[in-house]
Each structure stands twice: as structure tokens, then as C-alpha cells.
């Protein structure tokens, strides 16, 4: 009986010793192997917007008078028939895209295109379904919510052109951003 107690005691002591060594190793490993998030690099979106306004067949919109702390993170204009950055299929129409990060680190996207509005709306809204009415770019349009309920979009159409403001945000935040949109030029 005494031998069993001694053997069990040795096993317990060995497990405690292993735990004492293992926990600091795990903590040190976690501390030194974390990859910090890369800093957000602001971009100058105005030249892209000016080019889009000069070449697109629709009225190009962009935000004006955004409060301090907003950072542009994406600006792209792809003329119809040209491949997007990184190759791939050519854009079906003139496509303008802007992305901004708010001071609260929330991403707002502005997308415009003048061809195949149904396919464009489906892609940008993440296969969203209509969810009432809202305003985008000074125009009344439709609200869309993605299948998973996470992404909301405001869609305004003018003929074959579509303007979409989207983000993983409440409609009120999207409408506030959309209210800053004005024609470029």
C-alpha cells in the first residue's frame, strides 16, 4: 500500500513539474510569435476619382468634408474592357471603387459601375436581398442585406449605372456616409 502511494505521489510531482515548465514556455512562445497588424497605409484617392470622372460615362461620386480621422484605403478605376489589378476577367463596364476606414476602424465601401447592374449589385452586396428603402449618393434607392445578415448596402440606380455604399454597419451609418457623396469634378 505504501508503495502505491509513493508511486502515485511521484507521478503527481512529475506532472506538476512538467506543468510548471510547460506554462512559461507556452506564454513566451505566444508573446514572441504574435504578428502585429500592419499599419494602415493611407492612399491619395483624389487623382483616381478625377480620372474616373473624366473617363466614366456616369456621374462619379466621392465623399466630401469627411470628419477628421477618416483614412482612404482603396481607390481604383477600371475602364470597361480592361482587366482589373492582378489580372482576371476584364471589367464589364467603367468601375469606380473607393474604400475608407472610419476613426472607429469601420470600413465603408463606395462602388460604381455603368454596365450589368444586376450582376454588379449581386456581387457587391454579397448576394444581398432587398430590405427596404434608403439613400445613397443623394438618391433614394434600395437597402440590401447579405445572406448572412452581416453586410448592409445602399443601392441607387440611374439607368444602367449603379452606386453602392456598403459595409458591416447599420443602415444609419451607411446613410450618413452616403450623405457626404457629391459629384467629382
Task: Give each language-model segment a name.
Residues 11-21, 28-29, 66, 98-100, ...:
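Generic hydrophobic secondary-structure signal
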Residues 129-185:
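A short, solvent-exposed beta-edge/loop patch
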Residues 43-149:
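Short, solvent-exposed recognition patches
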Residues 1-73:
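Charge-rich, low-complexity N-terminal segments
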